[in-house]
């Protein structure tokens, strides 16, 4: 989930919802990566560009962040791409940072996340905070986990038969 008591994750969770992070000040990461839709936008392809909006959950275990960009091997490197892309969030880095620095509560959140930083509200701090929040997003529970949690209808009939056979045969 996005709730966290860790200052870096908390700042990142706040930035995921922060519209001022975009060049036009009107778009947040969560507008496209909607928690209620599995951190996607629910569409087969996102406009513009024709690619889908990838889910944000489960990225802590990934080593690559896109088949089309094998050079992107860290989440931070992947996050820099939409932040700099005019078709997505932006590239107005200085104007974006100025808007963020104008909010004393947000500057204080950066201070809690980066207590020893000589300068607060930098692009790299923002990327690090976003990465910490995204790394903390857990994948949704699979059918077997839901079954163990008491959801008797979680497994499809064939899976229930397989599970019964597994239990029977040990």
Q: Model-found features: residue ranges?
A:
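Periplasmic c-type cytochrome electron-transfer domains
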Residues: 1-170
